[in-house]
Curated annotation (Swiss-Prot):
Keyword Secreted: yes
Quaternary structure and partners: Heterodimer of an alpha chain and a beta chain. Beta-2-microglobulin is the beta-chain of major histocompatibility complex class I molecules.
SMART domains, per the entry: IGc1
Signal peptide: 1-21
Pfam families: C1-set (PF07654)
GO cellular component, one term: lysosomal membrane
Gene field: B2M
Keyword annotations: Disulfide bond, Immunity, Immunoglobulin domain, MHC I, Secreted, Signal
InterPro entries assigned: Ig-like_dom, Ig-like_dom_sf, Ig-like_fold, Ig/MHC_CS, Ig_C1-set, MHC/Immunoglobulin
Organism of this sequence: Monodelphis domestica
Entry function: Component of the class I major histocompatibility complex (MHC). Involved in the presentation of peptide antigens to the immune system.
Protein name in UniProt: Beta-2-microglobulin
Annotated disulfide bonds: C49-C104
Key word Transit peptide present: no
Length: 123
């Protein structure tokens, strides 16, 4: 009986910091949209959307061109931070000098509605 109690106590003590880290740090995802190179660069460019600080790990991230889902989108492997929140990078080739509007759309359980962040050519 005492072994069972010790295992239960140990499991409880190991799980509490994890649970505390998740509940104290999980808020809505942070979204950053940027190009790999400056828009005036002659290099082939990529639109990046870095989403961080989210938990649980289930998330949908879409890159948009004029409101429509972009093609040839690649996604990094899911990674996590010391506080047990998750991070993802999504990117796609794009022409920053076109007259199109580019954005990143994030859907997550901590959001009441999808979050759309537009790419700002000047930042």
């Amino acid at each position: 009986m005492s072994r069972l109690f010790l295992f239960a106590l140990l499991g409880h003590l190991c799980f509490l910091p994890y649970l505390d880290a998740i509940t104290s740090s999980s808020g809505p995802p942070r979204v950053q949209v940027y190009s790999r190179y400056p828009p005036d660069s002659d290099k082939s460019n990529f639109l990046n959307c870095y989403v961080s600080g989210f938990h649980p790990p289930q998330i949908t991230i879409e890159l948009l061109k004029d409101g429509k889902k972009m093609e040839n989108v690649e996604q990094s492997d899911l990674s996590f931070s010391k506080d047990w929140t998750f991070n993802l990078l999504v990117s796609a080739p794009f022409d920053p000098n076109s007259n199109s509007e580019f954005a990143c759309k994030v859907t997550h359980s901590t959001l009441n509605e999808p979050k759309v962040v537009k790419w700002d050519k000047d930042n």
